[in-house]
A protein has these predicted regions:
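Short, well-formed alpha-helical segments that are part of the catalytic scaffolds
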Residues: 30-46
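Acidic helix N-cap motif at the loop->helix transition within catalytic regions
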Residues: 32-36, 65-74
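Short beta-strand/loop segment that forms part of the nucleotide-sugar
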Residues: 50-62, 85-87
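A conserved acidic beta->alpha catalytic loop
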Residues: 60-69, 117
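Conserved donor nucleotide-binding strand/loop of the catalytic core
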Residues: 68-105
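Conserved catalytic loops of nucleotide-sugar-dependent glycosyltransferases that act on lipid-linked
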Residues: 90-95, 99, 147-247
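Short beta-strand-to-loop acidic/aromatic patch adjacent to the donor-nucleotide binding site
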Residues: 107-116
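Conserved donor NDP-sugar-binding/catalytic core segment of glycosyltransferases
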Residues: 125-148
Length: 247
């Protein structure tokens, strides 16, 4: 048995828990949800702890409520949790801030989800198992439970991306994605720091650059609180910017 363990270490020098995972979660005015979100996702970072180097990064985007204070309270019993606060810049800018923080601190893999309770940590493992095969594994909200208007917005965004960028992406803006840090490091500079839909543009860039992308179906529950980060105005803006960039 001991010999098998040695051979397994030789054949697989970088074990599962040696990969440094950074989970990035933006939060804005989520005082009613944030503790539950931490309770949900902290076990994931504990399991994939990267020999103590993995972290759950929750970025308070200038909340006007007690979101950040509650985050700090949560750190007392959760050493892998790192709360960050910054001036309000919107979801896209906050996600980008988190990605850059993860890259700067040596992440091997970066996972992003939101703080509204719509996603399930129980569905993370299929993403993690595919981490080495794909540059990006994105959730596909096959059966959305957050209303027909949100389905319409997603379909409209998909059409805008196809028209403006000439690529087809199943669900470009899903806040449930696992990414190789080394791939992200090559392309993140192409995204403006104040861009509203950073995840969308990142997926488009990966597709245009020929990176490997895999979509997996995920559950997407009704929003537990807060305000949606994407709307028709923002979709029109990304389309307008794409037209300008192509001139």
């Amino acid at each position: 048995m001991y010999m098998y363990a040695i051979m397994d270490t030789i054949n697989h020098p970088k074990e599962r828990n040696m990969d440094k995972l950074y989970i990035v979660i933006p939060a804005y005015n989520e005082q009613d949800n944030i503790e539950q979100v931490i309770n949900d996702w902290y076990p994931v970072i504990e399991k994939h702890n990267g020999n103590g180097q993995s972290h759950l990064i929750v970025i308070d985007d200038g909340s006007k409520d007690s979101t950040y204070e509650k985050l700090k309270q949560c750190t007392k019993t959760r050493p892998l949790l790192i709360p960050i606060t910054k001036p309000n810049g919107g979801h896209g800018a906050t996600v980008l801030y988190g990605y850059k923080y993860a890259l700067k601190n040596g992440a091997d893999y970066i996972f992003q989800t939101d703080s509204d309770g719509q996603t399930l940590p129980e569905e993370f493992e299929p993403f993690w198992k595919r981490r080495q095969k794909y540059d990006m594994v994105i959730g596909w909200r096959k059966d959305r439970q957050d209303g027909i208007s949100r389905v319409f917005v997603t379909k409209t965004l998909k059409l805008v991306i196809r028209i403006c960028f000439g690529v087809n992406l199943t669900d470009a803006n899903t806040p449930y994605r696992l990414m190789k840090a080394e791939t992200m490091a090559r392309y993140i500079h192409l995204i403006p720091k104040d861009f509203n839909l950073s995840n969308v543009l990142l997926a488009v860039i990966y597709k245009k650059k020929g990176c490997s992308i895999k979509f997996l179906p995920v559950t997407f529950r009704p929003r537990q609180g807060g305000v949606n980060s994407i709307n028709m105005k923002k979709i029109c803006k990304i389309g307008k910017q794409a037209v300008i960039d192509r001139k």
